[in-house]
């Protein structure tokens, strides 16, 4: 059971927004204060069939409407334990609430037939936040009951406890804030799930804690009179019993280093998809469950937490009217070739998901200097929320640009002018004034009388006075369609025009020594007024997109 899509109207800053979800895991990203955590809060109220306070209404005079598309069962043989004759696999429901209502109303979205609120409670929702003490809300009696059950299970399935592990758990009990049973439960789970091989490692405290949180919530559901567990359990054609569970995690990056962030989120997915045999055996023995059927929602501001698949990403953004909308990776429809490039380049563009605009450049030298150029021309990238991406070649720019545009991220791209005929009709593209970056730089510096400054940059880059070789000049002249015989090799500072301009020598050296370190030196050395106009134009265009949103 999972949510396939949701339309939210009149809730907080969601005037009218539609979202499509991945059945397994969804990562919500976007700017601060755009509604990501508010969405998780809405899930909690919705699954509990509670009314929302007046402050949550976008317009208190209008009702809040939430239209849900739910995938209930996997086949005609499946059913809910308390409704064996009902084999409905999918349904669309609408939850409505007015500010004056005591409780919300539930309707079949296709027939408008009013449904009992108990129907929405088939959704079991569990939330975790790194900034709240969720574990403290659980009564100590619950952990003590779990400790008893887990200790018996551990004693019958595991070997004797080594002395170092006994000392470690005693230390946790002595210095911890919770009842001792809480730490005992973590300890037992670490052994049951075979995660105590490094008794002081993070996996003992955090990965086992993830399992404890799920076990605790299942225990509370199994012992609750509000919603009987049988109301939620799905029985398949083989008689196996599964508990549908939606879990949300808000800001997992707090207190966790990048590897542990990913490890924790991956482990939650393993639990929800029954990929841990020991955990499944524990569910079977303690609760009579053969597994879970879960969907994960993660709100994060950390690129380290994000999965490397665009299909699991849901980005919230503001349109040209300032309204919050959603770009959902699960709903993208792309060709096979484009999809290959989307997956291949996605790790490079994660940071752009949080940006207000993006600049795409062809190579390493541009990548090394553009952020420094931005500071020089008065458009600091971090302040404006501008992300700079190295496409590693002209052919990749269009593909990465397409991916970013799918997520409704404003993009400008800088191409070398030698490909202008191919790309000039595309939206949001800019071109160098000369045939490439190196020509613009060398021409601009020499035209402004900054030859000495360019010599200093090259001297720092190579540790000696710059020299052009025959191969450098041959390569450059081939690019420029000039005769290399007109440009004898030698020290740059001695270069003089013979049958061609001096900038060709500097172009030849720069063209043969591309790299991010050279780019960094160029960015650090050029002052305002020295940055080539073509580069200023693209930076200012990105700055404008970052301040005046135009989706």
Positions of the model-derived regions?
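Conserved nucleotide-binding/hydrolysis micro-motifs of P-loop NTPases
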Residues: 72-75, 101, 132-135, 253, ...
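Switch/communication elements of ASCE P-loop NTPase nucleotide-binding domains
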Residues: 1-48, 200-348, 545
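Conserved P-loop NTP-binding catalytic core
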Residues: 29, 38-87
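Glycine-rich phosphate-binding loops of NTPases
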Residues: 54-56, 74-159
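Short glycine-/polar-rich loops that comprise or flank the Walker A/P-loop
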Residues: 62-68, 88-93, 120-126, 243-244, ...
């Amino acid at each position: 059971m999972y949510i396939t899509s949701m339309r939210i109207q009149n809730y907080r800053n969601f005037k009218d927004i539609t979202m499509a979800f991945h059945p397994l895991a969804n990562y919500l990203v976007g700017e601060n204060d755009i509604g990501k955590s508010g969405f998780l809060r809405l899930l909690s109220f919705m699954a509990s069939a509670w009314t929302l306070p007046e402050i949550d209404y976008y317009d208190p005079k209008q009702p809040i409407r939430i239209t849900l598309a739910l995938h209930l069962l996997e086949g005609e043989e499946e059913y809910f334990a308390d409704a064996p004759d009902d084999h409905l696999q999918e349904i669309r429901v609408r939850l409505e609430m007015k500010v004056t209502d005591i409780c919300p109303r539930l309707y079949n979205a296709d027939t408008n037939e009013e449904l009992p609120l108990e129907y929405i409670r088939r959704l079991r929702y569990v939330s975790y936040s790194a900034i709240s003490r969720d574990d403290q809300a659980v009564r100590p009696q619950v952990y003590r009951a779990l400790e008893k059950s887990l200790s018996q299970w551990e004693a019958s399935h595991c070997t004797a406890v080594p002395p170092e592990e006994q000392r470690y758990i005693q230390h946790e009990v002595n210095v911890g804030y919770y009842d001792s049973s809480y730490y005992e439960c973590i300890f037992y789970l670490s052994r049951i799930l075979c995660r105590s091989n490094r008794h002081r490692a993070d996996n003992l405290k955090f990965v086992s804690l993830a399992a404890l949180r799920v076990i605790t919530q299942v225990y509370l559901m199994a012992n609750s009179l509000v919603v009987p567990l049988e109301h939620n359990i799905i029985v398949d054609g083989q008689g196996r019993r599964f508990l549908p569970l939606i879990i949300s995690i808000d800001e997992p990056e707090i207190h966790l280093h990048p590897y542990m962030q990913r490890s924790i989120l991956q482990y939650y997915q393993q639990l929800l998809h029954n990929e841990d045999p020991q955990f499944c055996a524990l569910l079977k023995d303690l609760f009579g469950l053969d597994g879970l059927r879960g969907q994960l929602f993660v709100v994060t501001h950390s690129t380290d937490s994000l999965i490397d698949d665009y299909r699991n990403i849901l980005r919230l953004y503001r349109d040209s009217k300032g309204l919050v909308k959603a770009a959902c990776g699960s709903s993208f429809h792309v060709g096979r070739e484009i999809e290959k490039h989307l997956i291949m380049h996605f790790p490079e563009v994660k940071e752009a998901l949080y940006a207000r605009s993006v600049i795409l450049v062809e190579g390493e030298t541009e990548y090394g200097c553009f952020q420094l150029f931005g500071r020089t021309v008065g458009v600091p990238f971090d302040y404006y929320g501008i992300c700079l991406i190295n496409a590693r070649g002209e052919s990749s720019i269009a593909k990465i640009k397409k991916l970013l545009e799918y997520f409704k991220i404003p993009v400008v791209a800088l191409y070398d002018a030698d490909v202008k005929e191919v790309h000039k009709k595309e939206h949001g593209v800019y071109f160098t004034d000369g045939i490439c970056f190196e020509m613009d730089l060398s021409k601009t510096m020499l035209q402004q009388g900054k030859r000495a400054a360019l010599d200093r940059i090259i001297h720092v880059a190579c540790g000696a006075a710059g020299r052009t070789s025959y191969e450098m000049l041959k390569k450059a002249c081939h690019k420029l369609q000039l005769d290399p015989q007109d440009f004898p090799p030698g020290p740059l500072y001695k270069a003089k025009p013979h049958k061609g301009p001096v900038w060709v020598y500097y172009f030849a050296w720069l063209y043969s020594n591309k790299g991010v370190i050279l780019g960094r030196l160029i960015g650090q050395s050029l002052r305002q007024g020295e940055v080539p106009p073509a580069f200023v134009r693209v930076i200012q265009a990105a700055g404008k997109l970052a301040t005046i949103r135009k989706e």
